[in-house]
């Protein structure tokens, strides 16, 4: 005679086995701890354990939020501090409103999600006024140790803003900002700058392969704009003899005269725009000249396609980049700034930077140039 199946071989709370003599099987049920109702989970023990464990976790989180909410209401009424988790809920709501009103860009909004989630995970149960420098420093150290200093910079920047907002709403004392007290993570930039000679080599290969690549590279060098903005440029953006650009990253509005000429390559913006006009009807300056398996004739060339084809042409040019990583499409923006600076142009306005310090970063050739001794 077969042995009777064990009925109580699991220790997951609220999970119960029900043995059926009729079919000689064990059915699993989950008992809701609040309503007392049973929910059938079938005969698969592993699945039943997983479902019950997940249900218990969610109920525990729900209870924790309810307890925190009650605790925070009491604390607020008594003028005491609230928990970090509750403040982060309010901070998220503030960011939602800022996004809707246009105060921040979508990319900025998305960038805040991970750092907020990390702080909630590590210090959500602590009072917001009890989060200290060590809590933040430990978060940053993990990214630095993993070789991700750029992400550490992002986390620090967002958490500085979290505590700035907390100050504005009186949830922490004035000046209280443990994130600001942490050391700024340093990131060594290994990507090489692009020289004009290197640009010409890449341009010749890229233009011969895809004419739209030649157009995109000329626009990048003559206008100094970012990759995404170049991809989105339309003929309808041209009026009053200017090309109008609303920068995707910052929202800056720039009107570039068609008469602007980059002397180093002897191309004006008007010349480049004329080159972009061809037999393919398109709303975009950078567009496909013929239909392909992935795009129709006249369709916009997306930023990813420009990046990929630039990299291919760059590799075919067989340029020695030394110990650094090869230049990317974006490096044309720095080259443009340096060439226009030699012409005496106000490159800060052209690039759409709020401060001269931002522009100066682009002017740094990262060791490519030579310092000449004046006699």
UniProtKB/Swiss-Prot annotation:
<dbReference type="GO" id="GO:0009009">
    <property type="term" value="F:site-specific recombinase activity"/>
</dbReference>
<dbReference type="GO" id="GO:0046982">
    <property type="term" value="F:protein heterodimerization activity"/>
</dbReference>
<dbReference type="GO" id="GO:0046718">
    <property type="term" value="P:symbiont entry into host cell"/>
</dbReference>
<feature type="domain" description="Core-binding (CB)">
    <location>
        <begin position="82"/>
        <end position="167"/>
    </location>
</feature>
<protein>
    <recommendedName>
        <fullName>Prophage integrase IntE</fullName>
    </recommendedName>
</protein>
<keyword id="KW-0233">DNA recombination</keyword>
<feature type="active site">
    <location>
        <position position="226"/>
    </location>
</feature>
<dbReference type="Pfam" id="PF00589">
    <property type="entry name" value="Phage_integrase"/>
</dbReference>
<dbReference type="InterPro" id="IPR013762">
    <property type="entry name" value="Integrase-like_cat_sf"/>
</dbReference>
<feature type="active site">
    <location>
        <position position="333"/>
    </location>
</feature>
<dbReference type="GO" id="GO:0007059">
    <property type="term" value="P:chromosome segregation"/>
</dbReference>
<dbReference type="InterPro" id="IPR015094">
    <property type="entry name" value="Integrase_lambda-typ_DNA-bd_N"/>
</dbReference>
<dbReference type="GO" id="GO:0006310">
    <property type="term" value="P:DNA recombination"/>
</dbReference>
<dbReference type="InterPro" id="IPR044068">
    <property type="entry name" value="CB"/>
</dbReference>
<dbReference type="Pfam" id="PF09003">
    <property type="entry name" value="Arm-DNA-bind_1"/>
</dbReference>
<dbReference type="InterPro" id="IPR016177">
    <property type="entry name" value="DNA-bd_dom_sf"/>
</dbReference>
<comment type="similarity">
    <text>Belongs to the 'phage' integrase family.</text>
</comment>
<keyword id="KW-0229">DNA integration</keyword>
<dbReference type="GO" id="GO:0075713">
    <property type="term" value="P:establishment of integrated proviral latency"/>
</dbReference>
<comment type="function">
    <text>Integrase from the cryptic lambdoid prophage e14. Integrase is necessary for integration of the phage into the host genome by site-specific recombination. In conjunction with excisionase, integrase is also necessary for excision of the prophage from the host genome.</text>
</comment>
<dbReference type="InterPro" id="IPR002104">
    <property type="entry name" value="Integrase_catalytic"/>
</dbReference>
<feature type="domain" description="Tyr recombinase">
    <location>
        <begin position="189"/>
        <end position="375"/>
    </location>
</feature>
<dbReference type="GO" id="GO:0044826">
    <property type="term" value="P:viral genome integration into host DNA"/>
</dbReference>
<feature type="region of interest" description="Disordered">
    <location>
        <begin position="350"/>
        <end position="375"/>
    </location>
</feature>
<dbReference type="InterPro" id="IPR010998">
    <property type="entry name" value="Integrase_recombinase_N"/>
</dbReference>
<keyword id="KW-1179">Viral genome integration</keyword>
<keyword id="KW-1160">Virus entry into host cell</keyword>
<keyword id="KW-0238">DNA-binding</keyword>
<feature type="active site" description="O-(3'-phospho-DNA)-tyrosine intermediate">
    <location>
        <position position="362"/>
    </location>
</feature>
<dbReference type="GO" id="GO:0003677">
    <property type="term" value="F:DNA binding"/>
</dbReference>
<feature type="active site">
    <location>
        <position position="249"/>
    </location>
</feature>
<feature type="active site">
    <location>
        <position position="353"/>
    </location>
</feature>
<feature type="active site">
    <location>
        <position position="330"/>
    </location>
</feature>
<dbReference type="InterPro" id="IPR011010">
    <property type="entry name" value="DNA_brk_join_enz"/>
</dbReference>
């Amino acid at each position: 005679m077969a042995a009777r199946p064990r009925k109580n071989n699991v220790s997951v709370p609220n999970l119960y086995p029900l043995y059926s003599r009729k079919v000689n099987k064990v059915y699993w049920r989950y008992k809701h701890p609040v309503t007392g109702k049973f929910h059938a989970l079938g005969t698969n023990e592993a699945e039943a354990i997983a479902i019950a464990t997940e249900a218990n976790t969610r109920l525990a989180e729900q209870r924790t939020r309810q307890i925190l909410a009650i605790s925070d209401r009491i604390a607020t009424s008594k003028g005491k501090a609230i928990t970090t988790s509750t403040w982060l809920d309010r901070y998220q709501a503030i960011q939602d409103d800022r996004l809707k009103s246009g105060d921040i860009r979508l990319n900025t909004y998305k960038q805040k999600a991970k750092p907020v989630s990390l702080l909630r995970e590590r210090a959500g149960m602590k009072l917001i006024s009890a989060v200290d420098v060590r809590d933040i420093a430990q978060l940053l150290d993990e990214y630095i140790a993993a070789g991700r200093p750029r992400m550490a910079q992002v986390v620090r920047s967002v958490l500085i803003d979290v505590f700035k907002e907390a100050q504005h709403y009186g949830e922490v004392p004035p000046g209280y900002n443990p994130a600001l007290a942490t050391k700024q993570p340093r990131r060594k930039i290994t990507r090489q700058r692009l020289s004009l000679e290197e640009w010409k080599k890449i341009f010749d290969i890229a233009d011969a392969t895809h004419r739209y690549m030649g157009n995109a590279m000329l626009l990048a060098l003559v206008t100094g704009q970012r990759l995404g903005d170049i991809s989105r440029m339309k003929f309808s953006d041209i009026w009053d003899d200017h090309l109008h650009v609303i920068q995707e990253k910052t929202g800056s509005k720039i009107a570039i005269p068609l008469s602007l000429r980059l002397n180093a390559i002897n191309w004006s913006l008007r010349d480049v725009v004329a080159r972009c006009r061809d037999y393919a009807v398109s709303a975009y300056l950078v567009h496909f000249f013929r239909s392909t398996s992935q795009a129709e004739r006249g369709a916009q060339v997306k930023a990813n396609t420009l990046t990929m084809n630039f990299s291919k042409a760059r590799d075919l040019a067989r340029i020695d980049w030394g110990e650094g990583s090869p230049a990317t499409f974006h490096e044309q923006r720095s080259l443009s700034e340096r060439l226009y600076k030699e012409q005496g142009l106000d490159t800060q306005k052209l690039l759409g930077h709020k401060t001269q310090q931002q522009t100066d970063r682009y002017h740094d050739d990262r060791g490519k140039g030579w310092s000449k001794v004046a006699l």
